[in-house]
Amino acid sequence: ESSEMSGESSSRTSLDIPDVQRTLFKELLKTGKPVVLVLFTGRPLTLEWEQAHVPAILNVWFGGSEAAYAIGDVLFGAINPSGKLTMTFPKNVGQIPLYYAHKNTGRPLHEGKWFEKFRSNYLDVDNEPLYPFGYGLSYTTFNYGDITLDRTSMPMDGSLTAKVILTNTGSRDGA
């Protein structure tokens, strides 16, 4: 979406990619050439169609004057994409608001029970977002080892330190 479509005083009832852009994108996919959706946006969008039809989505938000160089380095494999989402992307605007580590309805859908009447879960979509807070992929793989905490309990306003052994098990550098 354009920068004028997000931010203060820029509310939209649909969080889909604008129709003219989706039409162009569908035409590009018809060519049979490899296509990557490079997503310039200032907010989470609903991308279920794109996720189902596109082999790769790179969310770049709105970058600065050198963004094109950085995006090119990622697309051509010079560097590894390593960002994680700072916001949750919904499947549908009806799921909004979505919060990290919170159930999004009063009584969420039970595993394996798609339709339950008289519950405040969604009847037409599951409870999971399209992309949760912290989601992100990489050109490499990692193994997470044991986690240790510096204490077994924490007071209300306290803090703790967690340590984890992280090993890059892939053939590429990554973060």
Where are these regions (language model features)?
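Secreted, periplasmic, or luminal enzymes acting at the cell surface/secretory milieu
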Residues: 40-174
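Hydrophobic helix-and-loop "lid/oligomerization" segment in the mid-to-C-terminal part
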Residues: 1-53
